[in-house]
Amino acid sequence: MKLNTNSNLYTFIYSAVMVIIVAVLLAVVSQALAPKQQANILLDKQKQILGALKVDYSAGNPAEIYMVLVNDTLTYGDKEVYVANLNGETKYILPLSGKGLWGGIGGYLALDADKNTIYGVNFNHESETPGLGAKIVEMPFREQFEGKHIRNAAGEVVSVAVLKAGKHADGQEQVDAISGATITSSGVSTMLEVNLAEYAVFLNEGNGDASLNGENDENVEPVKEEE
């Protein structure tokens, strides 16, 4: 029996077969590309951490440079702290995540061994406005944080405020917000405050009893990742 190619049945069968074939091909391609995608994600993360450490990797292999400098990872619950040895000095790198004006923002904050002085920062964003909020990734904004302290005079973790020029934070060190990008700048300020609070257990080890996360922090033990 000859199949009528103009019939509804033929159209349905043809469409179903094509959908199945395309779905299978997409699944195969996705599986084939998955390892490369994961490798790219890891490399981007390593580059961002090196950026927070102010390491120029343009003339070398960033993955190899990262492996030499970042020699440990500490885990506090679901939070990770990367430990680097930079010219014989210990640096702690904390991942950051928050919200900007149009989407997510994030980055990495590098602290000196005193867990107080900011060594460097590296920010990223999903969709902030070019020339305005997107400037959080640029050096003039990032360099303001270098040398700032996240603790107040009493040793409590209070973060660093991002404020419009002329405004002053009470009991906090501060940097200037980006002109014309109030919401993104506020997002960076909130991101730092919230994320540092989430790292209270790590930050307050060896720094007295001050804590931003409540009275149960002492029950959380740091765990080193297995190599």
Which residues make up each language-model segment?
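Flexible, solvent-exposed loop/hinge segments and secondary-structure transition points
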Residues: 2-227
